[in-house]
Amino acid sequence: METIRADEISNIIRERIEQYTREVKIVNTGTVLQVGDGIARIYGLDEVMAGELVEFEEGTIGIALNLESNNVGVVLMGDGLLIQEGSSVKATGRIAQIPVSEAYLGRVINALAKPIDGRGEISSSDSRLIESPAPGIILRRSVYEPLQTGLIAIDSMIPIGRGQRELIIGDRQTGKTAVATDTILNQQGQNVICVYVAIGQKASSVAQVVSTLQERGAMEYTIIVAETADSPATLQYLAPYTGAALAEYFMYRKQHTSIIYDDPSKQAQAYRQMSLLLRRPPGREAYPGDVFYLHSRLLERAAKLSSALGEGSMTALPIVETQSGDVSAYIPTNVISITDGQIFLSADLFNAGIRPAINVGISVSRVGSAAQIKAMKQVAGKLKLELAQFAELEAFAQFASDLDKATQNQLARGQRLRELLKQSQSAPLTVDEQIMTVYTGTNGYLDSLEIAQVRKFLVELRTYVKTNKPQFQEIISSTKTFTPEAEVLLKEAIQEQMERFLLQDQV
């Protein structure tokens, strides 16, 4: 029979005491007072931060937005149907953040960066705060590189630069999203990563954008963040910030990015819903007082970074829908005042068959020719002026019966210039194709053609130059200038093609 040795027992007890570490966890908790309509009011949570994530007993996550004297107003990231009054809530100590990585390219995700395309999880090691401060003045440099959209009307007269914020504004069904998707398609081979954020859109519209991008191989460099019309208001409010965080990840890694918000007015409506339910005082059009800050802190994150930070860029293209052309409503005026210019799409032009329906007269880019290559500046200088004069003359010509020859010629030229700006959807043009198109129009080579023949002639001219004068494209891409040599080549091509075209026409 073994004897029990007291010293061994005491040694074991001493070892166990030494190994014992007592973990004390202090958790900031509260109790649900009221829940409903995507909002919960919590008693307690004394040390919660503004914007901190809180976790409910059944797993729902919320964001603390209203810090009041006797309760905390929390917006829920989900339906919150299982949350009960009296259940406990704990503060997580974290601000909303999302995982980020290269693996997100080609994927469709929601506002919490979770995949919704049914293609499995996305691996990532890094994370970024959904809301992070915009780069300061010293960290930026002025915009000087063009972001080509592939649309002649924009690239020649309302140029967009890398790091700029350009608003696309117009009534519903005027082709706003088409301008944005064409811009994405045109970034193929340009080393630009695109992020498309769909806020409060129909799921069918988002699916259509995804399928267009997939067909053209553009999803390889695109991320789509989608919160459709049936998503909770909180997630619609967060979606643009999620998109911005993903674009920033690439921007700070010395890459060029372009982000499209479609559309911030839906985000403002979601924010208005949340604010009214939180009993914040309503202002103009029932929006809360800080709705300007909602959009300014989002769009200020677009930047062209300085050389010290690697010269990455983030170009923002917000799309805002107007009601029957009223750009003086609250959200449109706010976004116009934040952005560096706007592209107006007109329902009248769209219905008249001018597509893209860009109203060149009232569209503007505040970066201007700094965002154009020299060749485009040389060629497109007088295009906008001629179109503006034509628009004025056209209005006048409706009342005048007998016009002199010079006025008739100017009207004829203007009609042909307007014709050359027309483009099919998903058919962006390269810079050299745009330069030859604009040059042909502004130098009067189209004046002898019927208006109906203009587009056919231009399509054939582009093909002819590509096959018979490849040096033209080489000169433009290597020197970025419209040299005398390039002009001679183009003149030859136009004359040769014009002869062929007129011969075909006679046959």
From Swiss-Prot:
Main subcellular localisation: plastid
Family matches, as SUPFAM superfamilies: C-terminal domain of alpha and beta subunits of F1 ATP synthase, N-terminal domain of alpha and beta subunits of F1 ATP synthase, P-loop containing nucleoside triphosphate hydrolases
Enzyme class per UniProt: translocase
Catalytic activity: ATP + H2O + 4 H(+)(in) = ADP + phosphate + 5 H(+)(out)
GO cellular component, one term: chloroplast thylakoid membrane
Pfam entry (one): ATP-synt_ab_N
Site feature (Required for activity) residues: S363
Topological type in the membrane: Peripheral membrane protein
Family recorded in the similarity comment: Belongs to the ATPase alpha/beta chains family.
Name used for this protein in its record: ATP synthase subunit alpha, chloroplastic
Species of the source: Cucumis sativus
Originating gene: atpA
